[in-house]
Amino acid sequence: MDKRFAIVVSRFNAFITERLLLSAIDGLVRSGGKKNDIDLVRVPGAFEIPLAARKMAETKKYDAIICLGCLLRGDTAHYDVIVNEVTRGIGQSAQETGVPHAFGVLTCENLEQAIDRAGLKMGNKGFEAALVAVEMASLTAGIRRPASGPRNAASKKQVPRFARNDKDENRTDKDKNRNDKPKKKAGNTKRK
């Protein structure tokens, strides 16, 4: 695989995020990536992930960005605010830069859930985020790649204005004739 990836990982809840990080790197390598093609950025907390991911994406050096963090619900509304902003920020960055962002930010009710999702019972969300990044990088590269063959004005075929399809069968002769007549150019009309 000839792709470059950036991983943005939060230092907050490092016990969990380090497990996510190691698993994400493992997922990229198992998918054919090279460790030299992976850049890592550490941020203080999950709230800082979207900005760092955006800056990495704007360089256009990466085929995908993997965002890793862990948010645990507390006793205040702070958790809900941060979850919403992180989710919105990561999605907005992906949409506005055109670079896929894999969401590997755990949003858990308690530490036990986070531990489970970091590889002890339910797989590892870091690994899953890496697989998403690989798939989306390949998908978007295929969409951006031009179709095979030359792409210049001389090679373009003229496409008829009305392609034949089932709807053409339902048009009346009057409609067909009206659409097939050449249009008059402005300024060529004479009054009598």
Where are these regions (language model features)?
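Intrinsic disorder/low-complexity segments
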Residues: 141-192
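Glycine-rich oxoanion-binding loops at beta->alpha junctions
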Residues: 41-59, 105-106, 110-111
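Short, ordered loop/turn segments at secondary-structure junctions
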Residues: 11-12, 70-71, 106-110
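Glycine-rich phosphate/diphosphate-binding loop of Rossmann-like nucleotide-binding domains
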Residues: 2-44
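A charged, well-structured terminal subsegment
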Residues: 123-146
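Short, acidic/small-residue loops that bind anionic groups at enzyme active sites
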Residues: 80-107, 116
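Phosphate-binding/catalytic loops
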Residues: 109-123
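Glycine-rich phosphate-binding loop
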Residues: 48-90
